[in-house]
Design a protein with these regions (language model features):
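Non-heme di-metal
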Residues: 2-374
């Protein structure tokens, strides 16, 4: 397995020490790519530095293209980790708190060029790999049915990770699952907000209901972010500045990046609808197995499983709602976007499968503490 990428807010290492003495641009050409991009994101005077060295941007982009070749053509594990770690840092600029100095670089031209290079190459690679074709004359109902077939027939529906969590995993392994699940779960409110931007009027009621449920239906303590944070506190994980993204391998980072790519690029908005639909369809049955496993190892007495219990029940409704009230009317209005929705669905199924397989292997490799085996 590739080295895990630490997507920290501050890059580290000798080259970064040089950068602190003024050699930021030079350091960015020698650091591992994810550290280089994190360093640039944190450089508040990046515009001025790049303006003073007009040839530097092309050198950085050449380096990015080289890393992309290794990652997407050669499927080099470390290069995949570098690319997705860099992309994660770039997307963090779009959701970071406005008081953070790095927020000034949200639309930095050089960083935007890097992001667009990675996005185009990744989408092109995934498009060739998945080869999703839209029907010649799509209508909303047929696309909704196609998504349900894709979901029900995909191997990820019965992924062995969740059988393992239900029947065999130790408490330590289940807690490691929670930690790995953190970055996306704690970001999901923002992702739903992105889905509401520019939404068709027919879809707004369903999207608003999803957001209302995510926000706790008026009770802040029941918001999904707070429910999940309560779970982390009870099991001793607690909060982290990066929402524990530092534990993710490239597969986990790619799953997060998949959402963000479709969120921040209006041209890919309809891919987001397919990604979201699959997420709502997958969660209930898998989370039911997870909750069974949690209770098997003694969790649940402090209400800490409410986050997953909630998704077992409401995501059944949300899954049908996404298909019937969001995707169906939108495809009926604009049949040409059916291909993007189907691609998003297939893409999410594939990324979940890869992430679950990598996480399953990592959990199996954890040492089981004495007395923790089921």
């Amino acid at each position: 397995m590739q080295e895990e990428i630490v997507v920290s807010r501050t890059a580290a290492g000798p080259a970064c020490e040089d950068a602190s003495r003024g050699n930021v641009l030079d350091a960015a050409l020698t650091l591992p790519l994810h550290q280089a991009i994190s360093l640039l994101c944190d450089t508040v005077d990046l515009d001025e530095r790049v303006d003073a060295h007009p040839d530097w941007s092309q050198r950085l982009l050449s380096r990015v293209r080289s890393e992309l070749g290794k990652a997407l053509e050669q499927r080099d594990e470390q290069a995949l980790a570098e690319v997705h770690g860099a992309l994660f840092a770039l997307y963090d600029l779009h959701t970071c708190d406005g008081t953070e100095p790095r927020a000034i670089n949200q639309f930095n031209p050089t960083l935007t060029q890097v992001r667009r290079h990675i996005e185009r190459a990744w989408l092109d690679s995934e498009g060739r790999r998945l080869a999703v074709a839209a029907p010649a004359a799509p209508d909303g109902r047929s696309i909704a049915e196609a998504i349900k077939r894709m979901w029900s027939q995909h191997a990820v529906v019965s992924h062995p990770l969740f059988d393992f969590l239900e029947k065999e995993a130790s408490r330590e392994q289940i807690v490691a699952f929670f930690r790995s699940d953190s970055a996306l779960n704690l970001r999901f409110f923002d992702l739903l907000l992105y889905a509401m931007i520019g939404a068709r009027s027919e879809a707004r009621t369903e999207l608003a209901q999803n957001l209302w449920d995510e926000a706790g239906r008026g009770d802040a303590a029941q918001s999904h972010v707070n429910l999940f944070q309560h779970l982390l506190n009870v099991v001793g994980v607690g909060p982290a500045d990066d929402n524990h993204a530092s534990v993710l391998g490239w597969e986990g980072l790619a799953g997060h990046n998949q959402f963000m790519l479709a969120c921040v690029n209006r041209a890919h908005y309809f891919k987001l609808l397919g990604v979201m639909a699959i997420t709502e369809l997958l969660d209930p049955a898998q989370y039911e197995k997870l909750v069974n496993g949690c209770k098997r190892v003694g969790l649940g007495s402090e209400g800490e499983l409410s986050y997953y219990d909630e998704h077992i029940t409401i995501d059944v409704v949300h899954g049908d709602g996404w298909l019937t009230n969001v995707i169906t009317p939108i495809v009926d209005q604009s049949p040409a976007i059916a291909g993007d929705i189907l691609f998003g669905a297939a893409w999410r199924l594939s990324s979940c499968d890869a992430y679950y397989s990598a996480l399953h292997a990592r959990l199996l490799a954890l040492p089981i503490l004495h007395g923790q085996a089921a």
